[in-house]
Amino acid sequence: MSLARTLFIVLPMVVAALAVLILVADRIHRRPIVGAGLVMCAIGFVPVWVMIPVEPNVPPATLACFLVIIALLPGFSWRLTSGDLMVATAWGLVGLSVAAGSPLNYVLSDLVFGALPAYLAGRLLVERLGLRRVAEVLAIVWIAVSVLVLLEAVTTINPFSYITVHNNLYEEWSPPLARGSLTRVEGAFGHPIALGVCLAAGIPLILATCWRPGYRIAAGALVLGATIPTFSRSAIACAVIAVILSLMQVHTNIPALWRMGFLTVLVGVGSVLLPYVLGVFDSAGREQEDSAGYRGDILVLVRQLNPLGLSSAYQKSGDSVAWGGYSSIDNHLLLTALRFGWIPVVLIMAGLLVYLARAFIQRSNPAQIALLSLIPAYGTVAFITQIGTVVWLIAGMAASAQVSVLLESRNNTTGGGVGVVAGHANPWNRIRSGDWSCRAFAGRSVRPVSGADAGSH
């Protein structure tokens, strides 16, 4: 085919695609809630193997994050927190690690097309919409994903596996996995662990929406239940921790009776399901033991870490990579340290410790609780498929919500330190003054009430 004919066919397609992208970006700029929905739907309903066949291969959720950045970055306030500076420092060290021998493709895949767009998207969306409105969008998508997952568990049919794209990612992630004699659910996430961990990350945000307590608890229970047929110990543990940590926080705003009832039902149902789940794990037998043993064996690679740059354990033969003889590193903290050095990892872990301290003194926001609930996963699974996008998206949401805490301190207000709405008047001030409406939680303007009405609260 001649060059002229190729251009005649390709150029109109490129122009049409650009026109669509511009229209979508403009829509997101005018209504940021559209951007939140686009990102959440790309995570929950588009498999990672569905991507444009052009190098570099960019996951669909990352493309959605880039669209949000293009649309909302011009209006960014540039109010930065200590968390932003810590993350930026860690990323800067990751960039410098290239000079210390780290391959550039690791920086591109993990940072440029991974952590960076997801973090910025979460940061921008929460600044424009407030944490609870973004949480509501996530909750709706996560509920839909959970329903599909439970249907998949009953029927053993995963409709997303029928979305055929002839590439290496489809061959790697579309085949179903089993534990013992049972097929594990995967949804659009390509792996049971990825599905379960991402669902668990959404539970604190679901419980922090402005819905009625019963609706929030039902949604949280549904998502928690959807992690069980993944038969992933890490995912189930993360989900349980997410529920417990969320119910311990005052910002959840769920009455004590509802909390106790939820925990009682959780313990009761858990005691019934636990023998069944343990039976599935026992039927896996050697597979489960080998998996746990392997995760312990790879810890010997800690001895070969460098402060900055590629580990001496790096081995490459053709297209295959190994680390000290281990071809797979099921530990994201360790894998990151092997690729870029242990200093960036220590910085991120220090940030998690700060979030943990804030949780103990009731000063954390729901996104921070979500990050804390995933602690069991950070050391037991790599950030495969959509996990990295979800973690860094929530990290950006947590940082943006924290901005409102700084505004409270600067303005000598008493907003409660939860960072519900960043960049706007904190609604907790209204709540403390007696306004318990959903509008206050969403950061919308509230019509002033008369003295008589105010006294009726």
Describe every region a protein language model picked out.
Residues 49-58, 100-112, 191-193, 217-248, ...:
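Helix-loop-helix junctions and helix-breaking kinks within/between transmembrane helices
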Residues 67-71, 370-375, 384-435, 439:
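Transmembrane alpha-helices of multi-pass inner-membrane enzymes
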Residues 17-21, 67-77, 94-149, 351, ...:
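Transmembrane alpha-helical segments and their membrane-water interfaces
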Residues 147, 152-157, 247-286:
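A membrane-periplasm/extracellular boundary helix in multi-pass inner-membrane enzymes
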